[in-house]
């Protein structure tokens, strides 16, 4: 293992924020003894003395219960986000640029041998109905448990296709980038989470509608495809951090600082396939879609923990506490790659992750949307990125990381897949219509 040179680096500590008080009734210990006794007796005997509903409400008013309920109502409404829905229709599919949710699941399928072009058309028609029902809270047709779909918690379902599905429709429509990535020297792919013909990406803030949607989709796909693999990931729970906070991975790093934003002027050029793109790049039928690269990255956390904090920060090039570059500032301060230490060494080492990932070509950027995983004694990162063309965006970045990123000593790429994310669809239309046209 290359030796990590520890260079002292200190930052002022951050001041913890105060927790907000919880609204609602005071605990029983804080209430007068007589008031507590009356409350218990009234609740236990109200029906026996013939008080009825009206009398019970009157007693509640005397004890101030309605006032307490009114005081807590805003907090309850603020926390009640289970019924939130995100529109599934549009020029682009939902789930790519929407605010990341706390839970997600990738499902990859292998088409059955008999699933031909006509069967694929039927499959997409069924999938479209499922997406519309499950994400809206209305439940799809023949859902035996519609109650589980009633509160979708911002559920989105994003559909992608692999090379074999496109080949069965029309081999001439397959983009040149849609296939396995070139082999990188650090790859240790085990075949358990590689490739696929059809991809479903489900995301939600609540695992219950996520699990229900998974079961409904698997039921409806059974006649067309077999499940090849699934991967489940998570991020911080909603409300655990202020809105817009960059996620942390299980190494403790702030993960995803350098990321284009949907509001950026060049975002569309980086992420969405355009009508002017060549057929080899997916132009035409894939306009409004994107290319997804998914990498399963196992983290060697036990050995990572043995590295001292300055060594870990130099490996990344950022501080662990707030993700600021070692050259100073805050998380989003531009990195000074020319900065030197007092003894003349680069503040950002040549092997640092952020230096290896950095490019002076603004078109060589990707839109990252990662999540953590922790299962079966293994922890790591589900690294996902969307781009217009992996050949000119993800691959050059990964080649530089493969050559000299010291972080490679503690991470191993065990799964890899590339999918074409279908364009969006309108009400009354079906996913995949442009592919099948």
Residue ranges and their predicted role:
Residues 9, 37, 42-437:
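Long, histidine/aromatic-enriched segments associated with O2/redox biology
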Residues 1-38:
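N-terminal secretory signal peptides
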């Amino acid at each position: 293992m290359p030796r990590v040179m520890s260079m002292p680096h200190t930052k002022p500590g951050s001041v913890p924020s105060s927790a907000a008080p919880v609204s609602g009734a005071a605990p029983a210990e804080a209430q007068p003894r007589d008031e507590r006794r009356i409350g218990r007796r009234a609740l236990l005997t109200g029906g026996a003395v013939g008080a009825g509903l009206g009398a019970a409400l009157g007693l509640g008013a005397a004890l101030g219960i309605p006032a307490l309920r009114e005081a807590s109502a805003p907090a309850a409404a603020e926390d009640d986000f289970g019924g939130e829905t995100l529109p599934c229709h549009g020029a682009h599919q939902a789930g790519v640029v929407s605010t990341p949710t706390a839970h997600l699941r990738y499902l990859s399928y292998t088409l059955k041998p008999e699933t031909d072009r006509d069967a694929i058309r039927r499959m997409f028609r069924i999938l479209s109905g499922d997406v519309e029902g499950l994400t809206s809270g209305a439940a799809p047709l023949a859902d035996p448990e519609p109650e589980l779909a009633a509160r979708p918690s911002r559920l989105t379902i994003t559909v992608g296709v692999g090379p074999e599905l496109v080949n069965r429709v029309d081999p001439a429509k397959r983009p040149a980038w849609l296939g396995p990535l070139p082999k990188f020297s650090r790859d240790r792919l085990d075949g358990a989470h590689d490739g696929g013909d059809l991809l479903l990406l489900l995301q939600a803030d609540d695992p219950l509608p996520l699990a229900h949607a998974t079961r409904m989709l698997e039921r409806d796909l059974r006649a067309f495809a077999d499940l090849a693999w699934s991967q489940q990931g998570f991020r911080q729970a909603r409300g655990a951090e202020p809105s817009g906070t960059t996620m942390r991975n299980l190494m403790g790093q702030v993960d995803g600082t350098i990321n284009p934003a949907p509001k950026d002027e060049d975002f569309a050029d980086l992420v969405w396939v355009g009508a002017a793109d060549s057929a080899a790049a997916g132009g035409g039928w894939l306009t409004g879609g994107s290319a997804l690269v998914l990498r399963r990255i196992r983290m060697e956390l036990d050995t990572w923990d043995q590295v001292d904090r300055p060594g870990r920060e130099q490996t990344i090039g950022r501080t662990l506490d707030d993700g600021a570059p070692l050259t100073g500032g805050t998380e989003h301060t531009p990195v000074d790659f020319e900065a030197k230490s007092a003894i003349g060494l680069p503040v950002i080492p040549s092997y640092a992750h952020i230096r290896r990932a950095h490019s002076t070509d603004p078109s060589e950027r990707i839109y990252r949307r990662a999540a953590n995983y922790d299962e079966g004694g293994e922890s790591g990162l589900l690294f996902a990125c969307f781009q217009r063309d992996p050949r000119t965006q993800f691959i050059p970045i990964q080649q530089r990381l493969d050559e000299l990123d010291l972080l490679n000593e503690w991470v191993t790429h065990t799964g890899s897949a590339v999918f074409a994310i279908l364009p969006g669809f309108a009400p009354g239309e079906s996913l995949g219509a442009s592919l099948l046209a």
